[in-house]
A protein has these predicted regions:
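Hydrophobic targeting segments
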Residues: 2-7, 23, 34-37
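Short, well-formed alpha-helical segments that are part of the catalytic scaffolds
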Residues: 12-27
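A conserved acidic beta->alpha catalytic loop
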Residues: 38-49
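Active-site-proximal specificity loops/subdomain of glycosyltransferases
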Residues: 52-84
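Short glycine/serine/threonine-enriched helix-capping/active-site loop
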Residues: 63, 122-127, 206-207
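Short beta-strand-to-loop acidic/aromatic patch adjacent to the donor-nucleotide binding site
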Residues: 88-99
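Conserved catalytic core of nucleotide-sugar-dependent glycosyltransferases
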Residues: 101-180
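C-terminal catalytic/acceptor-binding lobe
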Residues: 175-243
């Protein structure tokens, strides 16, 4: 079974190091056949991340994008990772700012996906702490968290000829739909999710498999206080993993 994991660093170097270290502690680096790790010319301190990635045998390559693009480049880089690894059985999409809190997360996701032949992909249960699901009100208030689209924070996609065609023609990137009174922003993977539905394929959201997700660390969207809290938590966890 060939699994390709794809992740992008976008000024999130400490978070990505934590993601990799927590993955290695819970799933093991060897459980993934190919690691397609990219960096968007990050301007934060990348030294510890690059050193750890090199040590585990999964060097990080430049994506060709920078941190100052006028658009969200995430889906474009994920597409690049899929197109460069066409012979994989599964693709694992990983946000840089997730932390693995459960053992054998990926084999369990694959098993759940394989139990549903009408599903093209599966994402984890959304969680802020890796222990509890986010409040129902938060999920209901923002369907883009996981219900209206496959969220790429930790998702497994089954490779099929249809997936390859849609990745080539539709991609995983963002779109904007224009209406007379407003514009609708379609976040990463949302258009792909909608097109998959026209082919009678759904995406799953696990009820029990979860990771901790910091959310919104690549862009300056949080208050200074919340951003500092996330960074402090990340550093605390990194100290524990680094020993």
């Amino acid at each position: 079974m060939h699994i390709t994991a794809i992740s992008v660093n976008h000024n999130t170097s400490a978070y990505m190091e934590l993601m990799l270290r927590s993955f290695d502690a819970t799933d093991g680096v060897a459980s993934i056949t190919t690691w397609a790790l990219y960096d968007n010319a990050s301007q934060d301190d990348t030294s510890a991340l690059m050193a750890y990635a090199q040590r585990r045998g999964t060097p990080i390559n430049q994506s060709g994008y920078g941190i100052d693009t006028a658009f969200n480049s995430h889906g474009h880089v994920l597409r690049q990772g899929i197109q460069r690894n066409p012979d994989s059985d599964y693709y694992l999409l990983l946000d840089a700012d997730v932390v693995f809190t459960q053992m054998q997360t990926i084999p369990r996701l694959i098993a759940e996906l394989n139990a549903h032949p009408d599903a093209w992909a599966i994402g984890v249960c959304p969680s802020w702490d890796g222990i509890n699901e986010i409040p129902h009100e938060a999920r209901q208030g923002n369907p883009d968290i996981c219900d209206a689209r496959l969220h790429p924070c930790c998702a497994v996609l089954r490779n099929t000829p249809l997936l390859q065609r849609l990745v080539d023609t539709v991609g995983l990137h963002t779109y904007v739909q224009h209406y007379p009174t407003h514009d609708e922003y379609l976040d990463t993977c949302k258009m792909l999710t909608q097109v998959m539905r026209t082919h009678d394929f759904i995406h799953l959201v696990s009820d029990i498999i979860m990771v901790k997700h910091y959310f919104c660390t690549s862009y300056v969207w949080d208050s200074a206080e919340l951003a500092a809290q996330k960074q402090a938590d990340c550093q605390h966890r990194l100290v524990q993993y680094r020993g």
